[in-house]
């Protein structure tokens, strides 16, 4: 790698075509998500539809200002409606949720007591909540009953198992669904089974739970659908095992981001420079709310949140250690615009839909191509445009080729010297995915100040402990001698 180029170049990738007018942009946005190319393979694929079938579901979509089918919806709706197993890969923000909810709700038609007839599995509580909200909107005015398995209603169902017969569709994370099965939940009447973010559900930590759930679906008439924005070859092989004669739909290029995102690589030198450069971007007015900033882990999320809080920025944070109520509160404030900048770990990278996210910043370099695609997919959704900026250090340089490949396949222009960089080996990619690099702490305070603050905290802790012991001794009459 040419170190001089890395040290002196901020690489910006723009679409090759001249910038069109605003009116042309709007037309192109709509055309991109509704008339995009799709590669369909499998035995006797079903013909695509051109518009949503008329009826109450279509009317409910119109209330959300959704009047045209996206590409994935044109192909997936008739496929699932014909009860064909499906493996679907489409860019983030292309309407995958409606692509499977619409045909399932249409086929279920009316509420039928006796147990769940449709199961939707998603890797995170936040994504399940989002799917549930869309299902409620779409089924409004029907007699269909939908439930999202969560901590709040789990105990109610355990105490009153017959309540389960009230619902037609169940949405939940693998853990929640496995727990429900263990308490007596039956999936024997399930007609439709959907895996959203299927590649994640086939990863270690989820695959055993996913297998448990699939084993509980014993109906011979079940239709299985797997959706994701990225589907690695390994996942395709596993999908063939759990599906029967599936139709495979790939919208656009496999493992590519949508072309509605302006992607940029920004060399920052070292980890310690990142916060300074981020503040420069803020002061230059480069950050247009709303912004999502991705970091490598929970500790770095907390640290960056503290730094930006001191700058009096409307900032929030979401990570796995936050209680569910706090996570939901942060997401709600971000949606309402009360929070302008949301700091997140990869917990937020998958599936969650925010309207109006203008920019994504990868403060820490993503650990895989799939992580990159899902992260930047929080912007440029539903035909809107967005920006994605990825910080990289000298240590990250050997992995740039991975990201550059995604950029080029997404229709962006990439300098030849970047494409000439060697590809990281399989071993290097596995190492990065398994164990992210150790990074220096996020702070602009001097080491002396940090040590001073730590000593102060330790002193306060010691004083409180001594006071507690003294109070206990006085209460028990123990002199401590």
Swiss-Prot record:
InterPro entries recorded: DDX52/Rok1_DEADc, DEAD/DEAH_box_helicase_dom, DEAD_box_RNA_helicase, Helicase_ATP-bd, Helicase_C-like, P-loop_NTPase, RNA-helicase_DEAD-box_CS
Compositional bias per record (Basic and acidic residues), positions renumbered to this chain: 447-475
Q: Where is this region: Disordered?
A: 425-481
Keywords, A to Z, come to: ATP-binding, Helicase, Hydrolase, Nucleotide-binding, Nucleus, Ribosome biogenesis, RNA-binding, rRNA processing
Pfam families assigned = DEAD, Helicase_C
Q: Where in the cell is it found?
A: Nucleus, Nucleolus
Q: Name one GO cellular component term.
A: cytosol
Xref: SMART domains: DEXDc, HELICc
Gene Ontology biological-process entries:
maturation of SSU-rRNA
Principal location class: nucleus
UniProt domain Helicase ATP-binding: residue ranges: 77-249
Question: Which residues of the sequence carry a binding annotation for ATP?
Answer: 90-97
Q: Which CDD domains match?
A: DEADc_DDX52, SF2_C_DEAD
GO molecular function per UniProt: ATP binding; ATP hydrolysis activity; RNA binding; RNA helicase activity
In short, the EC number is 3.6.4.13
Known catalytic reactions: ATP + H2O = ADP + phosphate + H(+)
Q: Where is the composition biased (Basic residues)?
A: 428-443
According to its UniProt record, this protein's enzyme class is hydrolase
- Give the family, as the similarity comment puts it: Belongs to the DEAD box helicase family. DDX52/ROK1 subfamily.
Free-text note regarding domains: The Q motif is unique to and characteristic of the DEAD box family of RNA helicases and controls ATP binding and hydrolysis.
Q: How does it assemble?
A: Interacts with the U3 snoRNA and is associated with the 90S and 40S pre-ribosomes.
Q: Which protein, by its recorded name, is this? A: ATP-dependent RNA helicase rok1
* UniProt organism field: Schizosaccharomyces pombe (strain 972 / ATCC 24843)
Gene that encodes the chain: rok1
């Amino acid at each position: 790698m040419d170190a001089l180029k890395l040290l002196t170049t901020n690489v910006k990738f723009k679409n090759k075509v001249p910038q069109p007018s605003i009116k042309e942009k709007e037309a192109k946005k709509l055309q991109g998500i509704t008339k995009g190319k799709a590669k369909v393979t499998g035995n006797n694929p079903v013909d695509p539809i051109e518009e949503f079938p008329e009826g109450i579901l279509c009317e409910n979509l119109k209330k959300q200002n959704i009047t045209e089918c996206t590409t994935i919806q044109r192909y997936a709706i008739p496929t699932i409606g014909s009860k064909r197993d499906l493996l679907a890969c489409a860019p983030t923000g292309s309407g995958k949720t409606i692509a499977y909810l619409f045909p399932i709700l249409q086929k279920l038609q009316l509420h039928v007591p006796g147990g769940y007839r449709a199961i939707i599995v998603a890797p995170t509580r936040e994504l399940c909540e989002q799917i549930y909200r869309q299902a409620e909107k779409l089924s409004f005015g029907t007699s269909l009953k939908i439930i999202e398995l969560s901590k709040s209603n789990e105990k109610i169902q355990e105490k009153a198992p017959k309540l389960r017969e009230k619902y037609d569709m169940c949405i939940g994370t693998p853990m929640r669904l496995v727990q429900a099965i263990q308490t007596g939940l039956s999936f024997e009447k399930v007609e439709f089974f959907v895996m959203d973010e299927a590649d994640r559900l086939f990863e270690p930590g989820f695959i055993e739970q996913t297998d448990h759930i699939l084993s509980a679906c014993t109906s011979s008439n079940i239709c299985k659908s797997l959706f994701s924005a990225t589907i690695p070859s390994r996942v395709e092989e596993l999908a063939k095992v759990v599906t029967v004669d599936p139709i495979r739909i790939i919208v656009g290029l496999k493992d590519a981001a949508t072309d509605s995102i302006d992607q940029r690589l920004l060399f920052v030198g070292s980890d310690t420079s990142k916060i300074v450069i981020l503040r420069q971007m803020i002061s230059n007015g480069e950050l247009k709310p709303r912004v999502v900033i991705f970091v490598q882990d929970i500790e770095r999320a907390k640290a960056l949140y503290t730094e930006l809080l001191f700058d009096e920025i409307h900032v929030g944070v979401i990570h796995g250690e936050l209680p569910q109520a706090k996570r939901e509160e942060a997401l709600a404030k971000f949606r309402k615009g009360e929070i302008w900048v949301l700091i997140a770990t990869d917990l937020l990278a998958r599936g969650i839909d925010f309207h109006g996210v203008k920019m994504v910043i990868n403060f820490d370099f993503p650990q895989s191509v799939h992580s990159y695609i899902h992260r930047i997919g929080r912007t440029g959704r539903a035909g809107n445009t967005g920006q994605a900026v990825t910080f990289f250090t000298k240590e990250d340089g050997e992995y740039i080729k991975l990201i550059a490949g995604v950029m080029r396949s997404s229709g962006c222009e990439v300098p030849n010297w970047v494409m000439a960089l060697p590809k990281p080996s399989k071993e290097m990619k596995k190492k990065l995915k398994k164990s992210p690099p150790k990074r220096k702490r996020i702070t602009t305070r001097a080491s002396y100040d940090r040590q001073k603050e730590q000593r102060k905290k330790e002193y306060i802790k010691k004083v409180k402990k001594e006071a507690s012991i003294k109070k206990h001794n006085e209460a028990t009459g123990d002199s401590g001698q």
